[in-house]
Amino acid sequence: DSNCDCQKTLLANIKTNMLLLFHSKINFFMSEQQKNYYLKNVSKLKNKNNIVISSAFCDKDMSTIKSQKIDNKNDTWLIQKSNSWVKGTKNSIKYATEKKLNFKLFENLTREQMLSLFASSKGFIFLPNGFDTCPRTIIEAKLLGCEIICNDYVQHSQEKWFLNKTSIWDKIQNNKVEFWNIIKDHEK
């Protein structure tokens, strides 16, 4: 919501997050950068079990992605329209305009519609104003053959698993199994 009292909300979220992190048996993070940020800034977490698990995809979503035809790409760059300042829609529009890229804004699509749009488009521009630990849209766009333009706020963008489609598939297929194995190990 663009009208949120962000400072008050952020402070409340930080306090809640710290309570959860301090009292948990395991802390799951969405990216290495996110984990490292917390370890650097919250020394009490260094002795905790901190694990990067990333985004999770259900079998239906993975099947839908695999079923998309990606051999007929147009020259359109996609930008997700959002009223949330952190998503950086204005940054993405400015970038596309300055680079004279053919772009299209999208919003309020079903997952299937969005995946189909990614499958037929050249690329996806996402330039958030703040940390976005592991945005699914970036992962889905890359799996569907889109070129990606993003900034350092997309925290997983430089991680090894995100460098190519094969390693992305391997990562998301293993995430669910890895997560439940970790939970089972800690229940003992």
Could you describe each region identified by the protein language model?
Residues 111-121, 143:
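Short acidic alpha-helix that forms the nucleotide-activated donor recognition element
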Residues 127-188:
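Catalytic binding pocket for nucleotide-activated donors in carbohydrate/polymer assembly enzymes
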Residues 3-10, 102-105, 125-127:
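Short, flexible loop segments at the rims of nucleotide/cofactor-binding pockets, characterized by
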Residues 25-66:
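Donor nucleotide-sugar binding/catalytic pocket of nucleotide-sugar-dependent glycosyltransferases
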Residues 2-27, 119:
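Membrane-proximal helix-turn-helix segments that form the acceptor-binding/catalytic region
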Residues 19, 95, 117, 140:
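Hydrophobic/aromatic ligand-binding patch that stacks against planar heteroaromatic rings
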Residues 23-26, 74, 120-122, 145:
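Short, well-ordered alpha-helix to beta-strand connector turns
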Residues 55-112:
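Conserved catalytic-core segment of nucleotide-activated headgroup transferases in glycan assembly
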